[in-house]
Swiss-Prot record:
Keywords assigned: Cytoplasm, Endonuclease, Hydrolase, Metal-binding, Nuclease, Ribosome biogenesis, rRNA processing, Zinc
GO MF term list: metalloendopeptidase activity; RNA endonuclease activity; zinc ion binding
Lineage, highest ranks first: Bacteria, Pseudomonadati, Chlorobiota, Chlorobiia, Chlorobiales
The keyword Transcription is assigned to this record: no
Record's protein name: Endoribonuclease YbeY
Named cofactor requirement(s): Zn(2+)
Example of a GO cellular component annotation carried by this entry: cytoplasm
Enzyme class, broadest EC rank: hydrolase
Enzyme Commission code: 3.1.-.-
Residues that bind Zn(2+): 105, 109, 115
Homology family: Belongs to the endoribonuclease YbeY family.
Cofactor binding note from Swiss-Prot or TrEMBL: Binds 1 zinc ion.
Location in or out of the cell: Cytoplasm
Tagged with keyword Metal-binding: yes
Length: 141
């Protein structure tokens, strides 16, 4: 198993806890990590990746790439801490809560969940809430 986490910003983030959350969500979905890289970055990198791979010329909260099928996950996820901070303010939640929600969201994409339709978004939101309650309670941080 290889899970590597990189923080390319100056913002402090709970790296060990984020790794535990990623492992926990994937494990609960019946998956294991084979080779996964999690990059917590700023808007510049997020925009570049979003433009290059999805042809969207703007930064986004998360971009997730799954490179294989099956139970052993190989992939990458990129999370913009700038967008996480903006969304935390917009939704009136803490930066940490939003960071965990977006990390869980990314892990769910790795597990095969989509969010293109209203129904899929609602299902993912329910799963995010469930995993936030499981792994991200204040006493477990």
């Amino acid at each position: 198993m290889s899970l590597e986490l990189y923080n390319t910003t100056r913002r402090d983030i709970p790296e060990q806890k984020l790794m535990q959350v990623i492992e926990g969500v994937l494990g609960a979905e019946g998956l294991v990590i084979e080779d996964l890289t999690a990059v917590y970055c700023g808007n510049r990198l997020s925009r570049r990746i979003n433009c290059e791979f999805l042809q969207h010329d703007y930064p986004t909260d998360t971009i997730t790439f799954r490179y294989n099928d099956g139970e052993a996950v190989e992939g990458e996820l990129y999370i913009s801490l700038d967008i996480v901070a903006e969304n935390a303010q917009r939704f009136n939640v803490s930066f940490t809560d939003e960071l965990f929600r977006v990390t869980i969201h990314s892990a769910l994409h790795l597990a095969g969940f989509e969010d293109t339709s209203v129904e899929e978004r609602a299902s993912m939101k329910d799963k995010e809430d469930h995993y936030l309650n499981c792994f991200c309670q204040e006493d477990s941080l």
